[in-house]
C-alpha cells in the first residue's frame, strides 16, 4: 500500500433541526395551545485512531466529510431526531491541524479514544417553548444552528521508540531487517527506502520496542532536497536516535563528513532533536576484516566527530553486534519510560 503522511480534507458537522410551529387541533377543541416540538441536535464529527491503519491514503480520494443534520421538530410536542455522529478513523500518530489558522486541534496517539473535531449545531426551539401567561398562542420558533465547518490538514507522524538516521545506503534497512520482522526493501542503490518503515524488535517474550527506518537524508534535506524533508518530522516522537554510518563506503566518501551532514540537517530542521539521546552506530565492519585497521577507522571517526555518547560497531548483514545494540536500546527505553511515569 502506498504510504501517504499528509492530507487536506474538509469536515462539516450536521445542522441542528428547526423548531416546529404547530398548534393542537382536536375535535371540540378549536383553540388548542401550541405543541410544536424542538429540533434535534446536528451530528458531530470525531476522529479516532485505529491500529489497523498506517497511511492517510484514503483521504486522498475522499476529501469531504459531513455528519447528519438534526431532524426538525414536529407537532404533538415531538422532538426531532438527533443527527448521527460521524467517526473518522485515522492511523495512530495522526495530528489534526486547522488548515486556515494552523492551530493543532488534536494529537491522536491512543487507539479507541474518540476526539471531537467539529461540534454539531444546536437544535432549534418549537413554539411550545414560548408559551407564557401573556402569550397563549406563540408563533415564534428558532431555527437550528449550523454545525462547525473546518478545513483540516492531517499529518501522520509514526510512533516509534528508535529512529534510524543516515545517508542513503548506510545500511539502515538492512539493520531493521536484521533485528525485527520488518521486510524493508534492501538494494545497492540510494533511496531504496521511500517511506518510513516500522519494525518491532523483540528482545524477550515480554519486552519489545519499535524501530523506524527513516528514508536516507542528503545534504540540503532540511530545505527539501532528496526525500528527507518530508520525513524528518517522524523523528519527533522517538525516544532515541541512531546515527547509522557506513564505516567503509564504496564511493570513498568520508564517514565523518557524512555524519556531520546529518547533524547539520537536524540542526536546521529542528534543533530540539539534538536534545534526544543519540548513539553512533558504525555499520559494515565486515568490510574491514583486519582488526587493527578496523579499530583505527573506528577511533578516527569517533575523534573526528568528537563523539561523547555511546558507540556501537556492527555488521547488520551478518548480525554482528546487533544483539548488544538492541539490549542496550531496550534498557534505555525502559529507563526513559519509568522516569516519565
UniProtKB/Swiss-Prot annotation:
Bilayer-crossing regions: none
Domain Obg: 1-159
Region listing for Disordered, in residue ranges: 128-150
Domain of life: Bacteria
Residues binding GTP, per UniProt: 166-173, 191-195, 213-216, 283-286, 315-317
OBG-type G domain residues: 160-334
Annotated family: Belongs to the TRAFAC class OBG-HflX-like GTPase superfamily. OBG GTPase family.
Protein name stated in the entry: GTPase Obg
Amino acid at each position: 500500500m502506498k504510504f501517504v503522511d499528509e492530507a487536506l480534507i474538509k469536515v462539516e458537522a450536521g445542522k441542528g433541526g428547526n423548531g416546529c410551529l404547530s398548534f393542537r387541533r382536536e375535535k371540540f377543541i378549536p383553540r388548542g395551545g401550541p405543541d410544536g416540538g424542538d429540533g434535534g441536535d446536528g451530528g458531530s464529527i470525531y476522529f479516532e485512531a485505529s491500529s489497523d491503519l498506517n497511511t492517510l491514503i484514503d483521504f486522498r480520494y475522499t476529501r469531504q466529510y459531513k455528519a447528519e443534520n438534526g431532524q426538525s421538530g414536529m407537532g404533538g410536542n415531538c422532538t426531532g431526531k438527533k443527527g448521527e455522529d460521524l467517526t473518522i478513523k485515522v492511523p495512530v500518530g495522526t495530528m489534526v491541524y486547522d488548515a486556515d489558522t494552523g492551530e493543532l486541534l488534536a494529537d491522536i496517539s491512543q487507539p479507541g479514544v474518540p476526539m471531537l473535531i467539529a461540534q454539531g449545531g444546536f437544535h432549534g426551539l418549537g413554539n411550545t417553548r414560548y408559551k407564557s401567561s401573556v402569550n397563549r398562542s406563540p408563533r415564534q420558533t428558532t431555527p437550528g444552528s449550523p454545525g462547525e465547518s473546518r478545513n483540516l490538514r492531517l499529518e501522520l507522524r509514526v510512533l516509534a521508540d528508535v529512529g534510524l538516521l543516515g545517508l542513503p545506503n548506510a545500511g539502515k534497512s538492512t539493520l531493521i531487517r536484521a533485528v525485527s520482522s520488518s521486510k524493508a526493501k534492501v538494494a545497492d542503490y540510494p533511496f531504496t527506502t521511500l517511506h518510513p518503515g516500522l519494525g518491532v524488535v523483540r528482545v524477550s517474550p515480554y519486552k519489545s520496542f519499535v524501530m523506524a527506518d527513516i528514508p536516507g537524508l542528503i545534504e540540503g534535506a532540511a530545505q527539501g532536497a532528496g526525500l528527507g524533508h518530508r520525513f524528518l518530522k517522524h523523528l519527533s516522537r522517538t525516544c532515541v536516535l541512531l546515527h547509522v554510518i557506513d564505516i567503509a563506503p564504496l564511493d570513498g566518501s568520508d564517514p565523518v563528513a557524512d555524519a556531520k551532514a546529518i547533524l547539520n540537517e537536524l540542526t536546521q530542521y529542528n534543533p530540539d532533536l539534538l536534545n534526544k539521546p543519540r548513539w553512533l552506530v558504525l555499520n559494515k565492519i565486515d568490510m574491514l576484516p583486519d582488526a587493527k585497521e578496523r579499530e583505527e577507522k573506528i577511533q578516527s571517526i569517533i575523534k573526528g566527530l568528537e563523539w561523547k555518547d555511546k558507540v556501537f560497531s556492527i555488521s547488520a548483514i551478518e548480525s554482528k553486534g546487533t544483539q548488544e545494540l538492541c539490549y542496550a536500546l531496550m534498557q534505555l527505553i525502559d529507563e526513559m519510560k519509568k522516569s516519565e511515569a
